[in-house]
Amino acid sequence: MSTHQYQQLIEIFDNEFFADFNTRLIKGDDEPIYLPADDEAPYNRIVFAHGFYASAIHEISHWCIAGKERRKQVEFGYWYCPDGRDAQTQSEFEVVEIKPQALDWLFCQAAGYPFNVSCDNLDGDFEPDRVKFRRIVHGQVMEYLAQNSIPPRAARFINALQSFYNTPPLTADQFPWPEDPFA
C-alpha cells in the first residue's frame, strides 16, 4: 500500500479549509472540475479525477491561486482547451499552467510525493518540450521561495502537508535544476 492516498488529501484539505472557505475536495469519476456552491451542494467542490493523488494536488493548486470572485464561478471562469492541442494552443496552455504547476511541485515536496510536470497533451499533433516546461516551472518555484511569495492558501496547505507527512521546511535545494535526459 502506498503511503500517499487521496483520502489523506481529502482529510487534510477538509480540516484546513472547510470551515473558512466552505470548500471540499471530492473524488470524481471523470475529468476534474471546480464547482461553486449551488442547489446540488451547499459548499464549493474541488472535484479531482478518478481518485488520483496527483490530480487532487493539481486541482488544489488552481483553487489556491483563484481569487474570491473566480471561486464563485464554475472552473473559476476559465475556458479549458482539451487534450489534442496544436503547438500554438499548447504554448498558451503552458503559460497559464506555470504557477499552478509550481504550486504542484511545492505541494508534492511538502508531502514527500514525486512531482511530474504535466503538458497534458497526449493526443496532440506534436510532442511538447517537457524539459523546457519543467525548467520554466522550476523558475517559478524558485521565485516563490526566494521572494517568500507563495499565495496564502497555498502556504497554509504546504504547512498542513508538512505537518501530516512530517516533512522538513521547503528550501531551494530540494528543487534541483531539471536536467535534459537526452543531452
For each predicted feature, which ranges?
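Auxiliary, metal-adjacent structural segments of Zn-dependent hydrolase domains
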Residues: M1-E40, Q90-V95
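An active-site-proximal "capping" alpha-helix that borders the catalytic cofactor pocket
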Residues: E94-Q109
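Active-site recognition of the HExxH zinc-binding catalytic motif
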Residues: A54-G67
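Short pre-active-site segment immediately N-terminal to the catalytic Zn-binding motif
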Residues: S2-H4, D39-S55
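Short helix/loop segments within enzyme catalytic domains
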Residues: F107-N121
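Post-HEXXH active-site segment of zinc metalloproteases
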Residues: I65-I98, V117-E127
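Amphipathic alpha-helical core segments of compact helical bundles
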Residues: H62, W105-C108, H138
